[in-house]
Amino acid sequence: MDFEDDYTHSACRNTYQGFNGMDRDYGPGSYGGMDRDYGHGSYGGQRSMDSYLNQSYGMDNHSGGGGGSRFGPYESYDSRSSLGGRDLYRSGYGFNEPEQSRFGGSYGGRFESSYRNSLDSFGGRNQGGSSWEAPYSRSKLRPGFMEDRGRENYSSYSSFSSPHMKPAPVGSRGRGTPAYPESTFGSRNYDAFGGPSTGRGRGRGHMGDFGSIHRPGIVVDYQNKSTNVTVAAARGIKRKMMQPFNKPSGTFIKKPKLAKPMEKISLSKSPTKTDPKNEEEEKRRIEARREKQRRRREKNSEKYGDGYRMAFTCSFCKFRTFEEKDIELHLESSSHQETLDHIQKQTKFDKVVMEFLHECMVNKFKKTSIRKQQTNNQTEVVKIIEKDVMEGVTADDHMMKVETVHCSACSVYIPALHSSVQQHLKSPDHIKGKQAYKEQIKRESVLTATSILNNPIVKARYERFVKGENPFEIQDHSQDQQIEGDEEDEEKIDEPIEEEEDEDEEEEAEEVGEVEEVEEVEEVREGGIEGEGNIEGVGEGGEVGVVGEVEGVGKVEEVEEETAKEEPADFPVEQPEEN
């Protein structure tokens, strides 16, 4: 320190002499471009070099305030000089005050040089004054802090030589609360060294915080504000900290989907056959449902053409073909039986139920055959569709119609060329995709079967099937009406389902629904079918639900919700794991 002392003495002496000729204004001064009124004639004007040197080197060789000039050459403003006859070397840390003394008074004895110098090495004393005291302590904005009572600041930030590097001073308690409300940003906090931040303000007891953390940048006048403000500020910070955790929980609450279906189910069970209001509501619901089906049919007709309704489909296996032989072979194939076995394994249905589900697919095939026979002008319709497809296309557009092969497993269209098809069959994407698609079909087949059995029309049919009757005989005397209904049902299914198979299934389900909807729904509600009896009427009504499920679980759920409105979901079907 000898070299540093000599160097500092000479540098400061020169600086002080240079400033002697300058007019010093100890009133309101400007520091860093900001006008500040420091009250008791505190340091103003250009900040002298000695304040920087005192900060950097922590000079403590001279106790300012007693020389001929008000400020010694090696110190900035020392608040103790304005306090009267106090000991200049009394503890600025407040250790000599009775209510706060813990170490036996001031730095007398062995603490006079060693301990104080060790603290001064951090540049915080400035001859007992605070490195932040001069520019910050007497601000107009803090009238409550005008009374300096000797508790000067010692901060871990004071070692920064440049005032611009210092964060806004705050107290030792964190959250913007100064430790000395009656003084400046108080209390010579040296908790950065792990020691006690002495002085929590007069009347607050002499217990200091240990190891508290500074939170610079938050300034609050706690002398002029009530304690509620302090609490509000702290609480505001807590709220901000907690918000990120509340948001995910809020979104998580929206997850449960069982609430809506349960409400619908309870509403569907409550109405009775004799209640006219419920009947009117049921009619309105049916009309709204049919209107949706019509719109879906129009949409699907534009998308796929009218020919899609002429295809034979298996709702469980997602199989589609335009040839009767192909569908007959499929219904007798091992793959179709494997799908039914998977459904039985997942849902634990009885054999009677599985036979009924199979008969529903057979009946669907028969209905499509009848529709084809009645549509004698099918070829003409196809030609018209072809014209519509190429409408507006001219030679200048260089467009032509070609055939393509659609791969459902990969969701791609392949040119109808032998080489292209063979190349796709051998591609790794197709080999991997077909396995995943097969598993997807199995999962969706369970949902399809469940939704079919939850349909009230299907439940009524199942009851007749269990009794040994033919549940599909009703269609014979009203085939025309049923066909129209089926078409509408198909529309409903087609809308949610991009695949044509699903659309056909829905058409059949709705077809049956229009013919028997009102009567069967009432019967089912009266009967209150339980157990397998709830499976009534799976036939065509079930197909509608099936189609929705073919495209995915989401679509299936939509179909189930619509059916739940009209039916009592009594069927004791064990939901598959996928659900």
From Swiss-Prot:
A motif (Bipartite nuclear localization signal) lies at residues 238-260. The modification Phosphothreonine is found at T251. Pfam families: AKAP95. This is DBIRD complex subunit ZNF326. Signal peptide: none annotated. It comes from Pongo abelii (Sumatran orangutan). Residues 530-545 have a biased composition (Gly residues). Residues 483-523 have a biased composition (Acidic residues). Keywords: Acetylation, Activator, DNA-binding, Isopeptide bond, Metal-binding, Methylation, mRNA processing, mRNA splicing, Nucleus, Phosphoprotein, Repeat, Transcription, Transcription regulation, Ubl conjugation, Zinc, Zinc-finger. The gene is ZNF326. The lineage of its organism: Eukaryota, Metazoa, Chordata, Craniata, Vertebrata. Belongs to the AKAP95 family. PANTHER family: A-KINASE ANCHOR PROTEIN AKAP 8, DBIRD COMPLEX SUBUNIT ZNF326. Residues 1-124 are annotated as: Mediates transcriptional activation. It is found in: Nucleus matrix. GO terms for molecular function: DNA binding; RNA polymerase II complex binding; zinc ion binding. It comes from the Eukaryota. Residues 154-194, 243-302, 472-579 are annotated as: Disordered.
